[in-house]
């Protein structure tokens, strides 16, 4: 959840994990700039073998129920599961929320680096994501000492560059 004076944003994913396999049920985005509502809801229908989006992006696509398809939020959970399991190279079928198409994303551990968070140095796994259909590259800094938490994500492409960094670790007791 993120807020500022002009907008608030909430992203949610409802899913199940069974023996390391994620099954997405729904993905929700709530973006509320003061002047426009840009919500989007995505629902997986396992009986009808369809994924449907309503709201900002409207589409409906058929899918193979035997294929693990992940949304952008639970893909991070799957990355952690794979790294904890010792995988250094893997792929994830990622749902493109704008179109409903499913794109295979390839991941590979490329090394280690020290990342400083809250004045503490953490040895991080450097994980590189490759998307073969576009000119984007994403580098993840993941700290095994923090239960494989994402500390920094750098996404570079021809149209935009983004860096996300962890600001605070919350404790729920």
Pin down the residues of each PLM region.
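Hydrophobic, well-structured mid-protein blocks that either form specific transmembrane helices
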Residues: 36-82
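Acidic, serine/threonine-rich low-complexity disordered tracts
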Residues: 1-43, 86-173
């Amino acid at each position: 959840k993120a807020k500022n004076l002009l907008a608030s944003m909430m992203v949610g994913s409802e899913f199940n994990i069974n023996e390391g396999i994620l099954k997405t049920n729904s993905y929700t985005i709530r973006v509320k700039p003061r002047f426009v509502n840009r919500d989007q809801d995505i629902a997986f229908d396992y009986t009808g073998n369809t994924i449907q989006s309503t709201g900002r992006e409207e589409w409906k696509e058929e899918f193979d129920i035997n294929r693990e398809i992940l949304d952008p939020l639970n893909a991070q959970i799957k990355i952690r599961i794979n790294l904890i399991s010792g995988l250094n190279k893997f792929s994830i079928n990622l749902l493109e929320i704008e179109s409903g198409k499913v794109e295979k994303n390839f991941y590979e551990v490329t090394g280690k680096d020290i990342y400083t968070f809250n004045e503490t140095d953490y040895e991080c796994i450097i994980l590189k994501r490759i998307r073969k259909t576009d000119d984007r590259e994403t580098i993840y800094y993941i700290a095994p000492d923090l239960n494989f938490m994402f500390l920094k994500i750098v996404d570079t492409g021809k149209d935009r560059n983004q860096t996300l960094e962890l600001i605070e670790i919350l404790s729920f007791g």
